[in-house]
From Swiss-Prot:
Cofactor(s) required, per the database record: heme b
CDD domains for the chain: cytochrome_b_C, Cytochrome_b_N
MF term (GO), any: ubiquinol-cytochrome-c reductase activity
Family per similarity comment: Belongs to the cytochrome b family.
Annotated positions binding heme b b562: 84, 183
Name the record gives this protein: Cytochrome b
Organism: Phalcoboenus australis (Striated caracara)
Length: 380
């Protein structure tokens, strides 16, 4: 009998082992769909981004006009831009749900997979930030100024670092040029890191909602989960096209319809919605360096998750106390997101400070303590 080409061909063999004959736990739920959704988001962003880059000019005098030209005069340019801008929002929705799933079901105990995932998140955040600067609207310019300026809080080398990043003494043409170069490069770095992420995942196999080993009950990925993934793709694209066609500017800032002007500061500088929770944590500390450290800690704290797991059970499926804390954390993140979009005045300042404090308290103190307490309860 002739060997099956998909199992013997050097390249097809890799695809086969990752997407066709991959042994998968039979009980994984829709929460395990987000990995493939992130993959399709990345491919969509690279494709639409490439088409946009063909019509974009990375120059402070022409950037705003070139984006306007793309929307007005290029065939379906408006659609490509709307898909790209809203695709970024869906990318972040998927990655936040993916991380939430990881925390709820204890997936962080696969340390290598988890750590590469956090590096992917940081790279995605950097990509989204430099991309937001490219249309060169008011919020693009002032967002770039405020966020890059945070590096000046680093002792001794801070100011030099900022001027080196800017390529001058303020955000100007060199900044825009290098941000465009970075925005073009980073998605390919994300694609490379994704392969590393998957390599580590396939070393251990997928986790499942029960958190117990599933080697005795695995089924092939295709056709069972490939069909489930395709349903996910259809729902994602339905959501994306609905957003891009019916309310493309829903998640954007009206300030960005005004060309960048270094002489006029917008009344309220804020990043895109997906960074608002971190922005609220940054602003909740009145000291510049303290704020920057809190901002970094809000994401880097995820690296500590495997070490803060004190429960004998992997997932939260049968841990009601931890579940309550998890949903409290989710609610807390919504509050932080809302606070980040509000001006710095009473009562938003104190709400932001309390929400920031509770964010770190839940992750660093309450979840590990609850895990240990639930172990004790198991003995009764």
């Amino acid at each position: 009998m002739a060997p099956n080409i998909r199992k013997s061909h050097p390249l097809l063999k890799m695809v086969n082992n990752s997407l066709i004959d991959l042994p998968t736990p039979s009980n994984i739920s829709a929460w395990w769909n987000f990995g493939s959704l992130l993959g399709i988001c990345l491919m969509t962003q690279i494709l639409t981004g490439l088409l946009l880059a063909m019509h974009y000019t990375a120059d402070t005098n022409l950037a705003f006009s070139s984006v306007s030209h793309t929307c007005r005069n290029v065939q379906y340019g408006w659609l490509i831009r709307n898909l790209h801008a809203n695709g970024a929002s869906l990318f972040f929705i998927c990655i936040y749900l993916h991380i939430g799933r990881g925390i709820y079901y204890g997936s962080y105990l696969y340390k290598e997979t988890w750590n590469t995932g956090i590096i992917l998140l940081l790279t995605l955040m950097a990509t989204a930030f430099v991309g937001y600067v490219l249309p060169w609207g008011q919020m693009s310019f002032w967002g770039a100024t405020v966020i890059t300026n945070l590096f000046s809080a680093i002792p001794y080398i801070g100011q030099t670092l900022v001027e080196w990043a800017w390529g001058g003494f303020s955000v100007d043409n060199p900044t825009l040029t290098r941000f465009f170069a970075l925005h073009f490069l980073l998605p390919f770095l994300i694609a490379g890191l994704t392969l590393i992420h998957l390599t580590f995942l396939h070393e251990s196999g997928s986790n499942n909602p029960l958190g117990i080993t599933s080697n005795c009950d695995k089924i092939p990925f295709h056709p069972y989960f490939s069909s489930k993934d395709i349903l996910g793709f259809m729902l994602l694209y339905f959501l994306l096209t609905t957003l891009a066609l019916l309310s493309p500017n829903l998640l954007g800032d009206p300030e960005n319809f005004t060309p960048a002007n270094p002489l006029v500061t917008p009344p309220h500088i804020k990043p895109e919605w997906y960074f608002l929770f971190a922005y609220a944590i940054l602003r909740s500390i009145p000291n510049k360096l303290g704020g920057v450290l809190a901002l970094a800690a809000s994401i880097l704290i995820l690296f500590l998750s495997p070490f803060l797991h004190k429960s004998k059970q992997r997932t939260m499926t049968f841990r009601p106390l931890s579940q309550a804390l998890f949903w409290l954390l989710v609610t807390n993140l919504f509050i932080l997101t809302w606070i980040g979009s509000q001006p710095v005045e009473h009562p938003f300042i104190i709400i932001g400070q309390l929400a920031s404090l509770s964010y770190f308290t839940i992750l660093l103190i309450l979840l590990p303590l609850t895990g240990a307490l639930e172990n004790k309860i198991l003995n009764y």
